[in-house]
A protein has these predicted regions:
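Alpha-solenoid helical repeat scaffolds
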Residues: 3-4, 34-38, 68-72, 104-108, ...
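Terminal, low-structured helical/coil segments at or just beyond the last alpha-helical repeat
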Residues: 136-155
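A structural motif in tetratricopeptide-repeat
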Residues: 29, 63, 99, 133-136
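TPR/TPR-like (Sel1-like) alpha-helical repeat modules
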Residues: 114-115, 119-137
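Alpha-helical segment of the N-proximal tetratricopeptide repeat
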Residues: 1-34, 38-45
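Alpha-helical adaptor scaffolds
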Residues: 37-49, 54-104
Length: 155
């Protein structure tokens, strides 16, 4: 009940109410990956990247088969103290071996490579994400993604 309510509040953009709902969950369930996943959305909204990294590290450890855990961990690692694009890319390269058919990982690798100035690799990862996902939708998202701007600027 509280988990669904928290997800609803997040969908509506009310992160404080979402957090209030998560606090109502019994203590023994608060470390469940589903709860932690929602907690990540709240903390990422508030740009608490070190805490986000702790959360996603726990998710990946408990549920290594969750692609979103790996992607969110890379996003957190990119922004956390001592993180950065290189570390986030390295993590996603590891995840890509586990999930070779996941377009979200390929897309994020494209973003990190673009930011690192590795434009040929970025283009390859982006095309791979088109092949694995909804190419039309991904292209629309990619055109507005600041991380991919180096590709559109002619690199």
């Amino acid at each position: 009940m509280h988990l669904n309510a928290a997800a609803g509040w997040i969908h509506l953009g009310d992160y404080d109410s979402a957090n209030d709902e998560l606090e109502k969950i019994r203590a023994e369930w608060r470390a469940h990956p589903d709860v932690l996943d929602l907690r990540w959305f709240i903390y990422s909204h508030h740009e608490q990247w070190d805490a986000c990294l702790d959360i996603t590290s726990a998710i990946v450890k408990m549920a290594p088969d969750r692609v979103s855990g790996w992607v969110h961990k890379a996003i957190s690692l990119r922004r956390a103290n001592g993180g950065g694009f290189e570390n986030a890319k390295a993590l996603l390269l590891e995840a890509a071996k586990l999930f070779p058919e996941d377009g979200m990982i390929q897309y994020n690798l494209a973003c990190y490579c673009a930011q690192l100035g590795q434009l040929d690799a970025a283009q390859e990862y982006l095309h791979k994400s088109y092949e694995l996902g909804d190419a039309r939708q991904i292209k629309l998202i990619a055109l507005d993604d600041e991380d991919l701007k180096p590709l559109w600027d002619g690199g």
